[in-house]
Amino acid sequence: MGASLLLPLRRRPWTCRTCLLQARRSLETAASPATHRAAFDYLPSKNDAQKKSDDDTLRRVFDSQPFWREFSQRSAAHLKPTGLVQNQYLTSPDGFRVFATTTLQKCQAIVAKVLAGTTLEDYQSMARDLDRLSDLLCRVIDLSDFIRVIHPDPRVQEAATQAYALMFEYMNVLNTTTGLNDQLKKAAANPEVTARWSDEEKIVAQILIKDFSNSAIHMPPHARQRFVNLSNDISQLGNTFVNAAEPAKSHVTVSANSLRGLDPILVQQIKRWNRTASVPSMGLIPRLALRSVHDEGVRREVYLATRTSSARQIQRLEQLLAKRAELAQLSGYDSFAHMTLSDKMAKSPEAVSNFLTSLVGSNRPYVQEELAQLQSMKGSAGRLQPWDHAYYVHQRVLQYSQSRRSRELSAVPEFFSLGTVMQGLSRLFDRLYGVRLVPQETAAGETWNSDVRRLDVVDEADRHIAVIYCDLFSRPNKHPNPAHYTLRCAREISAEEVAECATTMDASAHPNDGMATAVDRDAKTLRQLPTIALVCDFPEPPATGTGRPSLLSEHSVRTLFHEMGHALHSILGQTRLQSISGTRCATDFAELPSVLMERFATAPEVLALYARHWETDAPLSESMMQHMEKDRTAHGSIYGAMENESQILMALVDQAYHSLPAGQATSIDSTAVFHQVSAEHCTLPDPTDTKPPTSWQGFFGHLHGYGATYYSYIFDRAIANKLWEDVFQQGKAAVDRQAGERYKNEVLRWGGGRNGWNCVAGVLGSAHPANADGRLVEGGDEAMREVGRWGLGRDGVSE
């Protein structure tokens, strides 16, 4: 499938891709649409009693199964059955077909309107019309994509898959509709039109024009067909590269006696009849062997095997790189990196390289400090080698755990029941941003599994502003990876859309398909509320209500805070147009809210809000908080900087591969490039004299999904560290409303409607030394270098 209109419009991060007839009168009177179940109306609490009750309920719905059963069954008597996530169509598998075809008809009407536009009024509405087209496409695609993965019923999975496919087929039609691009360009070039556009409309128009350009819609037919063919080849090659990664040799044969240090049970699993053992080159066993086998020669063999890809895997990668370079050349760019980065904060591969090399410099002293400690452990046995690193790191961690790690730390999870952590998130959001999480009963048919909890997000005036479905407990066949999904984006629903529903023959027609809406009383407009799903894989609490609830490790707590950071961006980034709402921002800015949220998870000021013993309700003691901090610092000092260097190296390799012009990319030697980058920037590089040479790049699956943008996570991490240090004062202002409002107003509320550099400069302030002479606002090479100088710090989290 070739490049398409939808994929850019969805603008989803790594991945991972947000009233009825009386509504029109509601807009005129600013009265609440009380006749509809789509959005719950909250009575103002007037005092703290309701808030306290909601807070207590939030903890209990996650920690007590009997309480949850009682809570979830209350709705049976007074709530009418509904569809999945309140979508009025999705009451049965066939509803996906009706949902998709009905939405398709709405899309076709918008396309016809745009193509027929001739008047000034027609062109003035064009940015908003195409934004609505994007919203309609994403309504089906995003929700169907999620349901086909998460729903336990195969019939629903199949129906969702078909709805998904139908909309993709329609996108192929849009890809050939050159008139959409032509009309939007006419509108954007007319000063009389743009003078009446809002800032959001101007931004969305430019985004869509760029997206059209990237999909080759402006090219002559033969070039466009070549573009589509290349896109198809890239997709297929990329998927194969990710899913068929393989080593040059499947295993390493060694003497079983030489595996001393490895768990004897594992040795028995791989032992052969002739006293040898076959160590696989992929999976958990080789990783454990590198950590624990005492024999350096064995570690060397295993290490080299795990770092050497098969020849056909390298061939796949090099074909992928060559086709991407050709695609960029066809589109008028010097390289794939130039094409990909043109609308990112970085703007160019040169700027990314400046950031990464600056980061190497700020990280290098910490790396040397860590390696010096490991070298002293190896002593006279020789110079530290790359296959030694995991082994001596493990030895240092064991030494630390045996000598200085506090026994109190083993009890820390008892203060992190899932309910208390969710309670803590709500309390933190209330302190910083004036919003909180309220457990809400669900109607029959609303959730895809009986253990899914619904939380409504309300503000200080008790106005409903978002919906979060929490699917946090493990179950058979559920994907274990934590994730955030935007099922419906925030946007303003126009009066015309409400009127359209009011005049339809279908009395149940709803401008948001029955999903959550709310009236903005100040603007007298109807809003489509963001609907979000959070998915994790935590153990379920006991059914009887006796015994421990689901207790989280520190790592799991940080993971939950990370995913909720994405949700927070969707909740507070409520723009008028959906193409720039919430997380729909530049790829290299999208991880900032989630990475920053991790810092709050274990800050003492935040722990004091929620960390309480699941049984006694005793708060986490100050001494335990101090031990947690010491433990993180100790682990970070053992391996944090080397982990940073590894991430930086991968980002540098990604840039080196994707910055090559088409002429050079067709004959690329990816292994030589990998070793060249390693020799220049890696403190402990792979040897270059092995035959065959190591070719770790064949296992770097993110080269497909994040081609030319792998730097994004560490870029956002550097920014997050700076904001934590200077805005939230290294945690001292972690629950300070003034700091929270500053961050919300300068970063979160904009979604993707403001240049990321303006957000960073705004939240740091014009007087900040890093923003001297407006260097951050301007972005570019110097701003990227400045962020590189901020560094990544060292952060180790014990399991």
From Swiss-Prot:
Subcellular localization: Mitochondrion matrix
Catalytic reaction(s) noted: Release of an N-terminal octapeptide as second stage of processing of some proteins imported into the mitochondrion
EC number(s) on file: 3.4.24.59
Source organism, top-level taxon: Eukaryota
Keyword line: Hydrolase, Metal-binding, Metalloprotease, Mitochondrion, Protease, Transit peptide, Zinc
UniProt GO cellular component terms: mitochondrial matrix
Pfam families: Peptidase_M3
The keyword Transit peptide appears for this protein: yes
Active site: E563
A GO term, aspect molecular function: metalloendopeptidase activity
Predominant localisation class: mitochondrion
Positions bound to Zn(2+): H562, H566, H569
Cofactor note: Binds 1 zinc ion.
Cofactor requirements of the protein: Zn(2+)
Any one GO biological process: protein processing involved in protein targeting to mitochondrion
InterPro entries the UniProt entry points to: M3A_MIP (IPR033851), MetalloPept_cat_dom_sf (IPR024079), Neurolysin/TOP_dom2 (IPR024077), Pept_M3A_M3B (IPR045090), Pept_M3A_M3B_dom (IPR001567)
First-tier enzyme category under EC: hydrolase
Family to which this protein belongs: Belongs to the peptidase M3 family.
Function: Cleaves proteins, imported into the mitochondrion, to their mature size. While most mitochondrial precursor proteins are processed to the mature form in one step by mitochondrial processing peptidase (MPP), the sequential cleavage by MIP of an octapeptide after initial processing by MPP is a required step for a subgroup of nuclear-encoded precursor proteins destined for the matrix or the inner membrane.
Name of the protein this chain belongs to: Mitochondrial intermediate peptidase
Organism field: Aspergillus niger (strain ATCC MYA-4892 / CBS 513.88 / FGSC A1513)
